[in-house]
């Protein structure tokens, strides 16, 4: 199988897995809505008030399961991504500007108090190679991890030629989490806690041909060393339809992460 067919097969696998998960979740959500409607009309106000916390918890878990399904489908193909993903020339700075803009717009809908700053002193563009879908996964996972620790966090994206730094003012990564990111070593604590966020961060980074190191605190500091910048004339211009689809997908991912965050917090 040639490289193009391999890429197509991987995308089909990932899409098929996501579709299968989502059909199951859609069925669960439909059943939940029927249950909610029945309770709305078949019980008295006192019983309804007693059952509402349970319904809210079920709704939260459905949101989390949908997110986990997307992550699991990514994880199922992550081991193959490094050998088959072909990073394309991109303007990383332009991608980051759009990501931050959408993130701020969506955060305003939930009245979340965190801030995000993009610094790229003296740069108009930051040419490198990467993959827009994988970049979306990388950034949304990073933001999700930060906000899970502190909803009022300050996130900083610092761009210099050949390098991207992600920082926040949170508690920072524990040593075993840093070892998982950079060396793939699972500790007993992390195995018990579960989750796919950290290994997916490493997989996205590796698949794009980027290098990841964990910097010193305070807060979390991740340094991404970027591949050599391609010539600007090597940039592939996407059609307006493709750009719109990319933007919509980016917004969907950000909205999902923030919805999970708000739902988790409301149940605490």
Name these PLM-found stretches.
Residues 80-85, 125-130:
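Conserved micro-motifs of the catalytic ATP-binding
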Residues 137-141, 145:
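Conserved polar catalytic motif of the HATPase_c/GHKL fold
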Residues 154-163:
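Short beta-strand/loop element within the Bergerat-fold HATPase_c
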